[in-house]
Amino acid sequence: ELVPYTSISEENKDEISTIVYKFCTAEFIDGLLMDWNNSTVMDRKRIPILQEAISLYNSELYYGCVSILACQLNGIITDIYNMQRAYGKEFDFEDVKMAYQSFNPQKKVPTIIKKDSERTQLLWFISDAEEGLMYWIKSIEYIYNIILTSKDSMNQSSHPCRNKICHGIQLNFGTREHALKSILTID
């Protein structure tokens, strides 16, 4: 149903939202939860937290759902990073620097890059994406540039901005749209 749409605009936003909500049924969301439950990547202690977030979503308690998922995102990024390292993937600073430059063309690459930073770990996923493991580049771009943003212009975004939510700056995230975007980001 989305085929005729090449982009989202004010004119077609409601139509696209209707199609997405129609597709993302309770059964669809339960399927995602089942996949998370069967995941060998995520820390097992994280699963009950994610289950509670989905329960809140199903009860239309969107502030709670988004808050939980926003707080879990960085931990999930680290879970994936640790799994990749456990499988022998090497962390190449040069690749991370190149990814940093492509995401931040207006900024100078820092001389010190923190390996344990979730944003750095995401950049490492980009450098590893050519092998097709887990993430598509556009998904990582969305998480890096939108979800993990600290830009003031995103204070009341239609996206769930993790840093803005967790620091009490973004206050408009109690919507079905924010909650569904949070769930799909985790997935």
Task: Identify the residue ranges that each predicted region occupies.
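An acidic intrinsically disordered interaction segment
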Residues: 23, 28-45, 128, 147-151
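Generic structural signal for short, flexible, solvent-exposed coil/loop and linker residues
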Residues: 17-21, 39, 51, 66, ...
